[in-house]
């Protein structure tokens, strides 16, 4: 793990890239921010922690070395499994931060979107300050991710894995995050309403050639095929479902998630 701090005092916010080694955009976004936020200049107020999390996995371009880092929080510092011990170290570094942004990419088609588990005032502020239209509530899923473990944390899917667009958008979004929390004061932050999608269940994947027929947040009519392979043919079991993280090759065991539009998230004091 690599940690670089800029600025001093409060608030203290963190931007974390490289949780998965096959998502190099996060590391590149952190490197771009380091170029802009020099020791002498760049931070107007407070402290920003810039973290590259899983350096060994990034070095070999694999999602993880032993186990998925984002499935093992809060971790165990005594563990012999690399990512499990790393999760505990990362948790210690970030504990007490006023706001945390975790950067990710996926094999899904755009648009980028935010993810949260626990809706606090800080999470609302962060999300409504992001340049995205959608935010996904994953509170019904596993409690072993960074955003489910540390308060005031959101994850951000910046775009398609391996694309330059994901890097450029991630830098833009990271700047927006820093403006939202007063670290950057070069311009006023912008807060906008977001569409909230609540995740309901994972959609399993089997063997054979996978096919996905709907993009993220595109409503699937009841009974229509969302995805199939040699084992499964998934038809939407009820009305109102939309895919989240839908892809043919993004995950070994799922096509993505079924979600449902649950309303909107308004900026504070709107």
Placement of each model-derived feature along the sequence:
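Structured catalytic-domain cores with a bias toward divalent-metal coordination
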Residues: 1-270
């Amino acid at each position: 793990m690599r940690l670089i701090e800029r600025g001093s005092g409060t608030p203290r916010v963190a931007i974390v890239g490289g949780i998965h080694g096959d998502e190099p955009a996060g590391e590149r976004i952190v490197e771009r921010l380091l170029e802009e936020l020099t020791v002498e200049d760049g931070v107007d107020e407070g402290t920003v922690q810039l973290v590259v999390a899983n350096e060994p996995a990034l070095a070999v371009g694999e999602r993880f070395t032993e186990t998925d880092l984002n499935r093992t929080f809060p971790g165990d510092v005594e563990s012999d499994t690399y990512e499990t011990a790393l999760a505990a170290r990362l948790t210690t570094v970030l504990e007490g931060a006023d706001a945390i942004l975790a950067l990710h990419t996926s094999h899904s088609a755009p648009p980028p979107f935010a993810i949260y588990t626990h809706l606090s005032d800080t999470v609302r502020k962060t999300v409504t300050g992001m340049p995205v239209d959608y935010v996904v509530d994953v509170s019904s899923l596993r409690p072993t991710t960074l955003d489910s473990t540390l308060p005031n944390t959101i994850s951000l899917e910046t775009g398609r894995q391996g694309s330059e667009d994901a890097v450029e958008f991630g830098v833009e979004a990271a700047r927006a995050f820093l403006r939202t929390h007063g670290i950057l004061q070069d311009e006023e932050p912008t807060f906008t309403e977001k569409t909230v999608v609540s995740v309901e269940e994972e959609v399993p994947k089997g063997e054979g050639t996978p096919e996905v027929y709907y993009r993220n947040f595109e409503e699937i009519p009841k009974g229509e095929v969302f995805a199939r392979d040699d084992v499964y043919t998934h038809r939407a079991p009820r009305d109102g479902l939309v895919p989240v993280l839908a892809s043919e090759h993004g995950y070994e065991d799922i096509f993505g998630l079924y979600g449902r539009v649950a309303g909107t998230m308004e900026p504070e004091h709107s």
